[in-house]
């Protein structure tokens, strides 16, 4: 087992449940409305909409890329995939929560498809980098897809195999993206929500491989 001190310094190993920070019972307060489109950030969402969680590195740039997509109704950033309930950003950055930075995407399947969102996901980052994304190093930057039903999961896994074949042709390593059923999602602090709309010159580490997912 990796020591807690090694998790703090190396940022490349996930904690065990016993090593994870305890967190808290109270949820993070978040704005009522999306800064860009004014729609509600929290459920209940209108009937007929679908959801997915994408993790593709720093959630600031990832969220902007996703809210710009046709058919996306609303987005929000948060933490998922770890053990610590209602974590803070600093706790997630310590590596001792087990969470990934993720974007909640609420979309209208009449206006876009899950497959189209998967294409955006794969092409917008490098899913072969493990516990990092570019210069952002840490388990919170790992690539993840957390699905809300069996159909989403099957589509995500099929797209991973298809994109892996294209990456191999371009000389890239194996995809490290985790695909799993949706775990508890915890909203990030208010200042992280739609960060790059509030701070247009803010940091964006999002960068793809240049490889395209076949239609």
From Swiss-Prot:
Full protein name: Peptide methionine sulfoxide reductase MsrA
According to its UniProt entry, the protein's GO biological process terms are: cellular response to oxidative stress; protein modification process; response to hypochlorite
Q: Please spell out the taxonomic lineage of the organism that makes this protein.
A: Bacteria, Pseudomonadati, Pseudomonadota, Gammaproteobacteria, Pseudomonadales
Q: What does this protein do?
A: Has an important function as a repair enzyme for proteins that have been inactivated by oxidation. Catalyzes the reversible oxidation-reduction of methionine sulfoxide in proteins to methionine.
Q: Which gene encodes it?
A: msrA
Kindly state which reaction or reactions the protein catalyses: L-methionyl-[protein] + [thioredoxin]-disulfide + H2O = L-methionyl-(S)-S-oxide-[protein] + [thioredoxin]-dithiol; [thioredoxin]-disulfide + L-methionine + H2O = L-methionine (S)-S-oxide + [thioredoxin]-dithiol
Question: Could you tell me the keywords of this UniProt record?
Answer: Oxidoreductase
Active site as annotated: 58
The EC number(s) given in the record are 1.8.4.11
Q: Which PANTHER family match?
A: MITOCHONDRIAL PEPTIDE METHIONINE SULFOXIDE REDUCTASE
């Amino acid at each position: 087992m990796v020591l807690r001190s090694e998790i703090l310094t190396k940022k490349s190993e996930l904690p065990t449940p016993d090593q994870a920070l305890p967190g808290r019972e109270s949820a993070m307060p978040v704005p009522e409305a999306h800064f860009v489109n004014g729609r509600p950030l929290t459920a209940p969402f209108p009937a007929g909409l679908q959801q997915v969680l994408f993790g593709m590195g720093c959630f600031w740039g990832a969220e902007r890329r996703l809210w710009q997509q046709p058919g996306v109704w609303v987005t929000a950033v948060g933490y998922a995939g770890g053990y610590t309930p209602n974590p803070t950003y600093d706790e997630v950055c310590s590596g001792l929560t087990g969470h990934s930075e993720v974007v909640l995407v609420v979309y209208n399947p009449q206006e876009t498809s899950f497959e189209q969102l998967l294409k955006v996901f794969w092409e917008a980052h490098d899913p072969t980098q493990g516990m990092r994304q570019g210069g952002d190093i840490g388990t919170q930057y790992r690539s993840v897809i957390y699905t809300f039903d069996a159909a989403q999961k099957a589509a995500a896994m099929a797209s991973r195999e298809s994109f892996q074949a294209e990456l191999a042709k371009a000389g890239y390593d194996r995809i490290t993206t985790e695909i799993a059923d949706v775990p508890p999602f915890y909203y990030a602090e208010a200042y992280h929500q739609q960060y790059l709309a509030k701070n247009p010159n803010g940091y964006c580490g999002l960068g793809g491989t240049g490889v395209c997912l076949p239609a």
